[in-house]
Structure formats: structure tokens, C-alpha cells
């Protein structure tokens, strides 16, 4: 490899640059699959390996976990969580970013249901309090048990 100045590696990285804006190889799996982060995410928690072998609903249920798609693939947000995460700013977060569903359960408002939408809202707000709220809202959005496979949604 050294004799040809690592041409194989250089070609591989050039080809990968056609598909990804950033990549990191820190494990042998990096040679075979890529951790893909959706464009609507700021953090990588909602990403997935590509290619991947997703779990089916039947497989999840075979482990004794009754699968409830909305409950397990959408952010779980309740009153206690909002108060604990945001303290005296919980009312602002409720008014701005989430909407009441039932009892003490909330969901993200459609206009702020992705981290990129939240990022845009905070683009001109750089104070410590705004950063704390922004990061908390990012965490709310990432608070899911399962991420649907984009190539095999079922």
C-alpha cells in the first residue's frame, strides 16, 4: 500500500466524500457500514448504521416487549420531565416547543419536531439560558426507544 502512496485509501475517502460531509472510522465496522445521521438531526443519537439489519416488530415482541409504534418511536415527554429539565423555564418550553396531548403527556409541536428546526429558532440566541433550553429541547426530541429504519420503515 505504501508503494502506491495509499491510493486505495485515497480513492475510498474521495468516494465517501461524495455521500457524507463528515465521517469517522474508529472501529473495524467503519470499513463495512456507516453511522448515518439524518439531515434533520444536530446530534447523532437518532442515526443508524447503513447498511443495517433492523429489528422487526415480531422480533421486538419475541423478547417480551409489546411494541407500540407511536409510544416507542416518538419522544416521550411528560410534565415531570419538563419541570426537571427546564425548571422555571418549563412554562416557556411548554408554550413554545411542545403541545399537551393528554393527562401530563406532551408532544413536540410540528414547527419544532426536529433538531434542525429548533436550531433555526435559536440561531440568533447565544446566551447561556438559550443554549440550556436549546440543548434540553434537543434531548427531548432524541428521547425515543426505537428509531424507524429509513429503508425498511416497518
What are these language model-derived features?
Residues 1-154:
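Catalytic cores of glycan-processing enzymes that make or break glycosidic bonds
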Amino acid at each position: 500500500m505504501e508503494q502506491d502512496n495509499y491510493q486505495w485509501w485515497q480513492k475510498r475517502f474521495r468516494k465517501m466524500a461524495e455521500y457524507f460531509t463528515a465521517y469517522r472510522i474508529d472501529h473495524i465496522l467503519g470499513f463495512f457500514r456507516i453511522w448515518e445521521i439524518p439531515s434533520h438531526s444536530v446530534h447523532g443519537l437518532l442515526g443508524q448504521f447503513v447498511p443495517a439489519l433492523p429489528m422487526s416488530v415480531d422480533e421486538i415482541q419475541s423478547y417480551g416487549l409489546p411494541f407500540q409504534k407511536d409510544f416507542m418511536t416518538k419522544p416521550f415527554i411528560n410534565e415531570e420531565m419538563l419541570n426537571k429539565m427546564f425548571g422555571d423555564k418549563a412554562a416557556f418550553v411548554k408554550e413554545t416547543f411542545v403541545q399537551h396531548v393528554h393527562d401530563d403527556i406532551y408532544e413536540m409541536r410540528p414547527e419544532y419536531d426536529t433538531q434542525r428546526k429548533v436550531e433555526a429558532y435559536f440561531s440568533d440566541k447565544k446566551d447561556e439560558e438559550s443554549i440550556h433550553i436549546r440543548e434540553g429541547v434537543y434531548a427531548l426530541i432524541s428521547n425515543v426507544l426505537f428509531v424507524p429504519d429509513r429503508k425498511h420503515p416497518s
